[in-house]
């Protein structure tokens, strides 16, 4: 089935008149510099076109932007050989100077910050402060654009305010600046958004096609980032998410398919199977968390499988009774072919700390880019050098 699927994609590609250029985007979480010891210089930037810096926060009292961690953002000495550089943003700026196609986008908000956006859009003064400080941040700290990560507007009034927010940013920001959103995959959240109105002001959409299922809210084991079909717990899949946005008027080239560089763990699972109940019991030797980076799975799992129909992978540890679902290299390659066949804009990952080295055969971004046709088919428009 996997080979048939790949052949189908390739047949559709054969009829395209020109080779499109693709975006490869990845979120960099600023807290990764601590426990994970993951720094900007560790990102294989030859495989990425856009880096999304997560997260910039909003001051609830004023509506102005603020750093979530000023120490690591601006002051923390970088590792060798870049000890003379202080702060992640300065390091990224130096990387941009040497790699003029690399773009850095500030991602504002993130999970658990919806109340901050609600506070901003409900007060005219805060709204003005937000827009003006966003422009100041972009110009001062060397960003190429703004990513709004409002998870999520709760009703049509807030959805209209999000449109207004995007419109005001687009009006004030120089046209060279990129504006994006982290867009939901769940149908309830999608239906609230005013997609066509938002699309007028957006450069592209980052579709969060992951976390379709998880131990904290699912009743059965499931793939959490499957491309097709029922994932085991519900009917969510990435292909349907993409089609929903297309049906609502977004051009495919503006859609960026989001993928995980982490797995979701289900504890208390009797056997390596999707769609079965689990107890959440954490046995000795298990991974305590319900999320783990792709590069931290370890070698305790004694069973691995890949579903070519749904495009999802799993590992299972029969001793600790834990099952993990994730994207493996086959998923990365099939999703790359899917993006080509559907003429989408590219791929996105959360987050950069999760992948294995590009020297490892299982490197997700390298497999993805190689399947697209190599780094030669990646977008190469120039970045902005200002600030910092």
Swiss-Prot record:
State which residues carry a glycan (glycosylated): 30, 82, 123, 132, 155, 237
Coiled-coil portions: none
Concerning SMART domains, the annotation shows: Glyco_18 (SM00636)
The cross-references to InterPro entries, in alphabetical order and at most eight, read: Chitinase_II/V-like_cat (IPR011583), Chitinase_insertion_sf (IPR029070), Glyco_hydro18_cat (IPR001223), Glyco_hydro_18_chit_AS (IPR001579), Glycoside_hydrolase_SF (IPR017853), Glycosyl_Hydrlase_18 (IPR050314)
Gene Ontology terms for molecular function: chitin binding; chitinase activity; endochitinase activity
Q: What is its main location?
A: secreted
Q: Which GO terms describe its biological process?
A: chitin catabolic process; polysaccharide catabolic process; sporulation resulting in formation of a cellular spore
Ranges that cross the membrane = none
> What family does this belong to?
Belongs to the glycosyl hydrolase 18 family. Chitinase class V subfamily.
Q: Could you tell me which PANTHER family the record lists for this protein? A: CHITINASE, CHITINASE 12-RELATED
Record protein name field: Chitinase 4
Q: Origin organism of this chain? A: Candida albicans (strain SC5314 / ATCC MYA-2876)
């Amino acid at each position: 089935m996997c080979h048939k699927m790949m052949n189908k994609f390739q047949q559709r590609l054969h009829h395209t008149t020109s080779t499109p250029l693709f975006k490869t985007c990845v979120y960099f979480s600023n807290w990764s510099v601590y426990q994970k010891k993951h720094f900007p210089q560790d990102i294989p930037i030859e495989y990425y076109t856009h880096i999304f810096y997560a997260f910039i926060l909003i001051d609830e009292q004023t509506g102005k932007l603020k750093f979530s961690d000023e120490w690591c953002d601006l002051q923390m000495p970088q590792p060798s050989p870049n000890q003379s550089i202080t702060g992640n943003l300065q390091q990224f700026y130096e990387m941009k100077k040497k790699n003029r196609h690399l773009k850095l986008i500030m991602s504002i908000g993130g999970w658990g910050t919806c109340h901050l956006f609600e506070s901003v859009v409900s007060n005219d003064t805060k709204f003005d402060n937000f827009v003006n400080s966003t422009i100041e941040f972009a110009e001062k700290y060397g960003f190429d654009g703004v990513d709004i990560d409002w998870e999520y507007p709760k009703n049509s009034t807030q959805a209209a305010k999000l449109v207004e927010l995007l419109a005001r940013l687009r009006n004030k920001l120089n046209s060279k600046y990129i504006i994006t959103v982290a867009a939901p995959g769940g149908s309830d959240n999608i239906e609230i958004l005013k997609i066509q109105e938002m699309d007028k002001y957006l450069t592209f959409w980052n579709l969060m096609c992951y976390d379709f299922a998880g131990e904290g809210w699912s009743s059965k084991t499931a793939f959490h980032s499957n491309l097709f079909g029922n994932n085991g717990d519900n009917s969510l899949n990435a292909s349907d998410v993409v089609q929903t946005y297309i049906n609502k008027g977004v051009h495919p080239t503006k859609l960026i398919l989001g993928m995980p560089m982490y797995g979701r763990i289900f504890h208390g699972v009797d056997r390596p199977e999707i769609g079965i109940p689990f107890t959440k019991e954490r046995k000795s030797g298990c991974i305590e968390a319900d999320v783990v980076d792709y590069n931290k799975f370890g070698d305790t799992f004694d069973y691995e499988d890949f579903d070519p129909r749904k495009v999802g992978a799993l590992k299972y540890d029969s001793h600790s009774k834990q099952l993990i679902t994730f994207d493996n290299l086959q998923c990365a390659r099939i999703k790359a072919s899917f993006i080509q066949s559907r003429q989408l804009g590219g791929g996105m990952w959360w987050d950069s700390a999760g992948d294995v080295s590009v020297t490892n055969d299982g490197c997700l971004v390298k497999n993805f880019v190689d399947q697209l046709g190599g780094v030669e088919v990646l977008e190469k428009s120039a970045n902005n050098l200002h600030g910092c």
